[in-house]
Swiss-Prot record:
Belongs to the peptidase S1 family. It comes from Mus musculus. The gene is Prss37. PROSITE patterns: TRYPSIN_DOM. It is found in: Cytoplasmic vesicle, Secretory vesicle, Acrosome; Secreted. This is Probable inactive serine protease 37. SMART domains: Tryp_SPc. InterPro entries: Peptidase_S1_PA (IPR009003), Peptidase_S1_PA_chymotrypsin (IPR043504), Trypsin_dom (IPR001254). GO terms for biological process: binding of sperm to zona pellucida; germ cell migration; positive regulation of acrosome reaction; positive regulation of fertilization; protein maturation; proteolysis; regulation of protein processing. It comes from the Eukaryota.
Length: 237
């Protein structure tokens, strides 16, 4: 089932208001997938496992957890290399709705107030549920290519009908659709609203590369729970 989320993006930046101080939101489950290519965001679902979009399978990938600010260290920073990356078996450029992969970490993450797991949704989300769009953005002092600020935005889940009216929504199955009231002007805007969290569980991860405009597509995690659980249990050793 496709669902659509309507949200308001404040003018100027993706998720950040025009204030002198930017507040970092609480999202300790976010993992930054750092590479020499485009930025990507995943979610720590178990101590040794990160769930992420399959298109984030990039050379020289490193998983960053904890504090993401390069200029300020607080002891929560962790960089862990993957030892195995497992793409969803049906993923291809012609089947972008299956844009998921599991990353097994070389060692378990060390939990702290900025590093925590997020359970995955085992039921579908009902229309009208207010969910959180959680991702990474660039702080005002950050002129680099890597995001460093956790940001959250609330938005209600809408029905499948509106999603079907959009070109993006009608061409994806197992999807949640997001309609942005204002378009993104920033390159790599997808990392700012990379995940959908409903009732404190991971419900969606962005599909494909965000190409601008007012529609975002998310993989509905609920449809992939059997594959996620089977894979993470089989690969424990």
């Amino acid at each position: 089932m496709k669902l659509i989320i309507y949200l308001t993006i404040l003018a100027g930046t993706a998720l950040v208001t025009h204030s002198s101080v930017q507040k970092e939101d609480h999202a300790p489950y976010l993992a930054y997938l750092k590479s020499n290519f485009n930025p990507c965001v995943g979610v720590l679902i178990k101590a040794s496992w990160v769930l992420a979009p399959s298109h984030c399978y990039l050379p020289n990938l490193r998983v960053m957890l904890g504090n993401f600010k390069s200029r300020v260290r607080d002891g929560t920073e962790q960089t862990i290399y993957p030892i195995q990356i497992i793409r969803y078996w049906n993923y291809s450029h012609t089947a972008p709705q299956d844009d998921l992969m599991l990353i097994k970490l070389a060692k378990p993450a060390t939990f702290n107030h900025k590093v925590q797991v997020l359970p995955i949704a085992t039921t579908n989300v009902r229309p009208g549920t207010v969910c959180t769009l959680s991702g990474l953005d660039w702080s005002q002092e950050n002129n680099g290519r890597h995001p460093d600020l956790r940001q959250n935005l609330e938005a209600p889940v809408m029905t499948d009908k509106d999603c079907q009216k959009t070109q993006q929504g009608s061409s994806h199955r197992n999807s949640l659709c997001v309609r942005f009231v204002k378009v993104f002007s920033r390159i790599f805007g997808e990392v700012a609203v990379a995940t959908v969290i409903c009732k404190n569980k991971l419900q969606g991860i962005e599909v494909g590369h965000f190409m601008g405009g007012d529609v975002g597509i998310y993989t509905n995690i609920y449809s992939y729970v059997p594959w996620i659980e089977k894979t993470t249990k089989e690969k424990m050793t």
